[in-house]
């Protein structure tokens, strides 16, 4: 990790941005996909009218995504469904597919991003792929019905607090109705205070990458220690 004073030196920030761009482009070239490029909300062609509650699209960094996935405190991936809320062009879905999850799902309200993600899933080429049940779902996140399996939920600050609050409320209710292990990885946690309102999901000590928090269900038989 590069200290902030170093990042602010002349030319360093530009060099870091260039290096990041190269890494994204290499990932796309190597795996025959297209995950790069931001997309503003007005361009998204959303399935809902509440576009003001969404954030613009910017993909997770492949290196950070792989680190997060490698440090998940779960013993048997095959029991869990991985869900990226606000999954964009599907980069985290492709990274998650490198692990033997029961299924990998992306929830995306933009028709444009969903279409790209669907193409990426179909074209993805990676000898490390372990999960082949991968799908992008084009739906308002508030209307998404969480699977009954244990879950790993990934949030890269995808929504404004009003929308995120409702999604978390739905998730908490799902855990209450069907107690099971649920992990939530929240990157760039600007609205972390919303988790304080949840009854069945609480923060753990885990911080797999800088600027991340991990939450876990406190269903019977599960500890919030993160182990």
Positions of PLM-derived features:
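Active-site segment flanking the S-adenosylmethionine/decSAM binding pocket
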Residues: 136-176, 180
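Residues in the short beta-alpha loop(s) of Rossmann-like NAD(P)-binding domains
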Residues: 110, 120, 188-190
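Conserved SAM-binding motif I beta-strand of class I
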Residues: 103-108
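C-terminal substrate-binding/active-site "lid" region of AdoMet-derived donor-dependent transferases
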Residues: 162-219
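Glycine-rich SAM-binding Motif I of class I
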Residues: 90-94
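Conserved class I S-adenosyl-L-methionine
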Residues: 79-88
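S-adenosyl-L-methionine
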Residues: 1-78, 114-148
């Amino acid at each position: 990790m590069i200290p902030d004073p170093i990042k602010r030196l002349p030319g360093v920030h530009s060099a870091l941005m260039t290096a990041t761009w190269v890494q994204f482009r290499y990932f796309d070239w190597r795996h025959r996909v297209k995950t790069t490029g931001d997309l503003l909300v007005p361009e998204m062609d959303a399935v809902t009218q509440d576009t003001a509650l969404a954030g613009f699209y910017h993909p997770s960094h492949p290196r950070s995504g792989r680190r997060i996935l490698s440090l998940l405190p779960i013993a048997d991936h095959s029991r869990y469904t991985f869900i990226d809320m606000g999954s964009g062009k599907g980069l985290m879905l492709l990274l998650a597919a490198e692990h033997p999850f029961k299924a990998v799902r992306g929830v995306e309200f933009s028709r444009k991003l969903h279409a790209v993600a669907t193409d990426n899933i179909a074209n993805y080429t990676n000898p490390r792929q372990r999960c082949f049940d991968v799908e992008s779902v084009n739906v308002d996140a508030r209307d998404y019905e969480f699977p009954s399996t244990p879950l790993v939920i990934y949030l890269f600050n995808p929504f404004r607090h009003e929308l995120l609050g409702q999604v978390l409320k739905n998730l908490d209710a799902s855990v209450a109705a069907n107690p099971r292990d649920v992990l939530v990885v929240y990157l760039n946690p600007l609205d972390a205070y919303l988790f304080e309102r949840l009854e069945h999901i609480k923060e753990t000590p885990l911080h797999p990458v800088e600027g991340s928090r991990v939450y876990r269900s406190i269903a019977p038989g599960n500890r919030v220690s993160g182990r």
